[in-house]
């Protein structure tokens, strides 16, 4: 006999928009994101990403990375499997015009705030926590100025975890 449990969906599904780093680091990022409960991972092919994929190879990478998430969920015992998509450019993702209640972007720019501050401001303004969020993480060398401008124009708020420059996998 097996015991079954009903586990509610996360209250604020998070989409991780992660620039693809060199080597197999993306697999570790997907694994950790799965363990932390991210709802979806969208690998990004930014201008500074050193990976050139045609549609067929991009689809294969998406399938391979989905398998990484499956293995991670088996290992950690999480109840929800994130969807890992095939890689897209930031422009392609923005063209989808998806709406998130709290879109944020990791930033090295002045004026960036800790994510907690944005969550608190949202709570104060709407009397509840956000029901969806996305987090943009750039590549080594960060997003280009044009990419940051496009992402910010779509409503993403700049966040920081402090004064240190963190590695992409952190």
List each language-model region with its residue ranges:
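Glycine/charged-rich beta-loop-alpha catalytic/anionic-binding loops adjacent to active sites
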Residues: 11-15, 131-133, 153-161
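Short amphipathic alpha-helical segments
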Residues: 30, 55, 117-119, 147-150
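Short, acidic/turn-prone active-site loops that include or flank metal/cofactor-
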Residues: 110, 140, 163-166
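A C-terminal functional module that forms or caps the active site or interfaces directly
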Residues: 130-150
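Structured adenosyl-cofactor binding patch, chiefly the S-adenosyl-L-methionine
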Residues: 145-170
């Amino acid at each position: 006999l097996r015991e079954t449990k009903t586990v509610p969906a996360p209250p604020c599904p998070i989409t991780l928009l992660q620039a693809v780093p060199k080597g197999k680091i993306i697999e570790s990022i997907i694994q950790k994101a799965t363990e932390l409960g991210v709802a979806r991972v969208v690998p990004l092919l930014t201008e500074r990403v050193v990976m050139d994929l045609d549609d067929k190879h991009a689809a294969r990478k998406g399938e391979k990375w989905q398998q990484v998430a499956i293995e991670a969920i088996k290992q950690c015992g999480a109840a929800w499997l994130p969807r890992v998509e095939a890689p897209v450019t930031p422009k392609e993702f923005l063209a989808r015009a998806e709406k998130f209640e709290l879109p944020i972007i990791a930033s090295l720019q002045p004026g960036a705030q800790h994510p907690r501050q944005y969550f608190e401001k949202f709570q104060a303004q709407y009397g509840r926590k956000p029901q969806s969020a996305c987090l943009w993480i750039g590549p080594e060398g960060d997003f280009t100025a044009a990419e940051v401008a496009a992402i910010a124009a779509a409503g993403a708020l700049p966040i920081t975890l402090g004064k240190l420059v963190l590695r992409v996998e952190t």
